[in-house]
């Protein structure tokens, strides 16, 4: 699924492991990035600094390295982020800066309580950023 606007989506997922890779940077102009996720393993990967959105998507899927990887976020001239709650839900966010992308991903999830049984506190906790990636021309 590709998101080209400032939208975020909540995804059900397993534990997330992230990988980021930069692609061939453009001297000027529009740069694209993508984040891919595997539903079976929770692996996430990114690819940034591509002149073509399709190339960014293909690179993110390739770097993810799992058969069921799919692009969950496409961004242009900015940043993307993946957050995971203690309940294992995952959300993505996009923004012109890393901070804005991370905030959006966290805000989509909000605080979450750990699944039962949990040996620690059952109090809701904020989501953790597991991957962020920015194009070279991000703000």
Residue ranges of predicted features:
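Helix-coil modules at protein/domain termini and other flexible surface or pore-lining loops
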Residues: 2-139
